[in-house]
Amino acid sequence: MHFTLLNEKDFFNPYYRKKQIIQNEFDIFNKALMQYLERLESSQSENEDYLVANALSPFLTMLNFKTHIKTKQKGKSEIDLSISKDEFSKDLEVLIEAKKPNSKEFITHTKVNSKALHETILYYFRNREYSFSLKFIIITDFYKFYI
């Protein structure tokens, strides 16, 4: 399997770079981002579940995403965080696997074969049976996001 590291210019559709930024929306995003970073800094000693519930999920919720913490899977496994179209939908659009910063289980651009990637692939296979709306899988250490 081969992975290609893309920069922001290659990843985003050129349309979005040309689109006018609405100041009010930018201010909301900036405020949410500052609160997210403050929560991360004050919670460095906490575990992944705490960081997902008290930093990442509130950040995404402030940006109007419908988040679900610890979505149950077959067996004992749980998706750390997921995003759906609405709060009652079982159709997940985004799966998020979180690892603590500097975790050996986290993916990097030089070390792709990691536990974080294996878990997201497992969750994808389990979800595709009943959910056809999955669009993205995100692996994060709360500072870096691999899509």
PLM regions with names:
Residues 1-136, 144:
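A short, conserved, highly charged catalytic patch centered on acidic carboxylates
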